A protein has these predicted regions:
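N-terminal helix-turn-helix DNA-binding core of bacterial DNA-binding proteins
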Residues: 2, 10-51, 73-84, 88
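Beta-hairpin "wing" of winged helix-turn-helix
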Residues: 61-77
Length: 114
């Protein structure tokens, strides 16, 4: 995907952008259970179908979901591998911060002993 400045964004950026909206997070949770049609996905939301379709477009462009049209029904399914990219990024950040906090804890302990 390309950002507003015309630069290509990293895939993990697209995933986090897609997940930044609560409606899209609910859709991802729903698709985690099983594939669903547009009408099934849109049913719980109080919004016009074109607005809801924009959410599905963002999810599909991020690679989190894929759609398939059979006859008049478009069905969406989750692409779990894209979530793993976000999980991996978060795990790296967690490790980095845990290491920093451990170092800080050691520093505080050293100061307390002095």
């Amino acid at each position: 995907m390309v950002n507003a400045a015309g630069r290509r964004t990293a895939p993990v950026d697209d995933v986090f952008r897609a997940l930044s909206d609560p409606t899209r997070r609910v859709v991802v949770e729903r698709l985690g259970r099983r594939p669903a049609s547009v009408s099934e996905l849109a049913e719980p939301f109080d919004m016009a179908l074109p607005s809801f379709m924009q959410h599905l477009r963002v999810l599909e462009e991020s690679g989190l979901v894929r759609s398939k049209k059979e006859g008049r029904v478009r069905t969406y399914r989750l692409v779990p591998g894209r979530l793993r990219a976000a999980e991996d990024w978060l795990a790296k950040q967690r490790t980095l911060w845990e290491r920093r906090l451990d170092q800080f804890d050691e520093y505080v302990t050293k100061l307390e002993r002095e």
